[in-house]
Design a protein with these regions (language model features):
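Amphipathic alpha-helical dimerization/coiled-coil segments
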Residues: 83-117
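Short, basic interhelical loop/turn and adjoining N-cap
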Residues: 37-46
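Ser/Thr-centered flexible coil motifs
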Residues: 14-15, 69, 166-170
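Accessory beta->alpha helical hairpin/"wing" motif in late/C-terminal subdomains of nucleic-acid enzymes
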Residues: 48-83
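Short amphipathic alpha-helical interface segments
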Residues: 5-38
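Electrostatic, structured charged patches in enzyme active sites and in nucleic-acid/phosphate-binding
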Residues: 103-354
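Short, Lys/Arg-enriched N-terminal segment that forms or immediately precedes the first helix
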Residues: 1-10, 82-85
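Short amphipathic alpha-helical segments
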Residues: 43, 92-97, 165-173
Length: 354
């Protein structure tokens, strides 16, 4: 290989190394260190220092986080990723939250770079609310607090980053997700409540369940209670793995067949919200890796009405301790999905995508 060819190869490798961080910062505008430290694959410290040193990224600010420079946006355009340069804002905290969700999706292999409902309706990806608000003639969100939308088959989840003190116009949020679902031809809707951890997201909901404030203006807890689905997401690598599995079409069926018995007979047994019967305990079980609080509650009601003494929640290993706190024994039991079924599920999804 000639010297010129080697130089081009080195430049290509450098560009590929820079690209995830540059695209994510350019897209989200402000990303804080709390987020970047949780995703070192994209934002390792040596890379960030290099980007600052070469004038692509501004020095880190506790107030505004990581931001691209004019040269940074120019670099993206040169590499066929043109983006609107940053406009100064005092709402950087909200941008930090938006970025945490977008980066988690990116780490899960879900593109957060959708910019219109039309584009989003054709692909099962993630549509950030900030991209919709920035688009011309796309003011479909108004003053809604939604962070973004993700399609999982026929289900549309509206992502929110809840705060206990933040008030929600309940019907307006419901109307928003229903309207987007109709435009995307989704038949089911729900919410994805995001936070730095499962605990922080759940605490915001719990506060709202305790302190009701009215019919129109409510809390995130009320929003969750009125939903068909209320999933929790931790904005880190664990949450990214959760989303990666949730995105696999009909993932519950193959897992149910690998983990238990009678997976095709739940409706006849009066347990339509359950997934299978545990072969050892002979009790109904539900796959809970999606952390769907509403689904778990429905399954619990059905199991009790059918006369069972337990409902088994089968989840990922890092979800177990949290689930044990909010769904305690003796009625609830928490099981862990072994690595082998997870591996087979991922292998099947990889083959199907080829």
């Amino acid at each position: 290989m000639s010297m010129g060819g080697k130089k081009e190869e080195v430049l290509f490798v450098i560009a590929q190394d820079m690209l995830p961080a540059m695209r994510l910062i350019g897209w989200c505008k402000n990303i804080d260190q709390s987020c970047t430290s949780r995703f070192p694959e994209f934002f390792r410290l040596s890379l960030m220092r290099s980007l600052v040193r070469n004038g692509f990224v501004r020095p880190y600010s506790a107030t505004y986080g990581w931001r691209l420079t004019t040269d940074g946006y120019r670099w993206l355009e040169m590499h066929d990723y043109p983006m609107q340069p940053d406009q100064h804002t005092q709402r950087s905290k909200r941008r930090f939250e938006n970025a945490a969700v977008a980066v988690t999706m990116f780490a899960a292999g879900i593109s957060p770079f959708m910019s219109s409902i039309r584009e989003f309706s054709q692909q099962d990806e993630y549509l950030p609310a900030f991209a919709l608000r920035a688009g011309a003639n796309q003011n479909v969100l108004g003053s809604n607090l939604v962070t973004g939308f993700i399609r999982l088959g026929d289900t549309l989840l509206a992502a929110h980053y809840p705060h206990a003190e933040r008030r929600v116009l309940l019907q307006r949020e419901h109307d928003c997700v229903q309207g987007i679902a109709l435009r995307c031809r989704c038949t089911d809707t729900g919410y994805l409540f995001c936070g730095e951890s499962y605990t922080s997201a759940y605490r915001a909901l719990l506060h709202g369940q305790i302190k009701s404030v009215g019919k129109k203006s409510g809390t995130y807890g009320q929003l969750a209670n009125e939903a068909s689905h209320a999933c929790l997401l931790s904005c880190d690598l664990q949450g990214a793995f959760q989303m990666k599995l949730m995105r696999i079409p009909d993932y519950r069926l193959p897992l149910s067949m690998m983990l238990g018995e009678q997976s095709g007979q739940m409706i006849e047994m009066g347990l339509p919200a359950c997934d299978f019967v545990d072969p050892r305990l002979h009790q109904p079980a539900i796959i809970s890796l999606d952390m769907d609080l509403c689904h778990i509650k429905r399954a619990a009601v059905q199991a009790r009405e059918a006369g069972y003494s337990n409902l088994i929640l089968v989840a990922l290993d890092f979800q177990k301790s949290f689930l044990e706190q909010i769904f305690p024994p003796p009625f609830f039991r928490i099981g862990i999905i072994p690595d082998e079924p997870i591996g087979k599920l991922e292998e099947g999804a990889a083959r199907a995508s080829v």
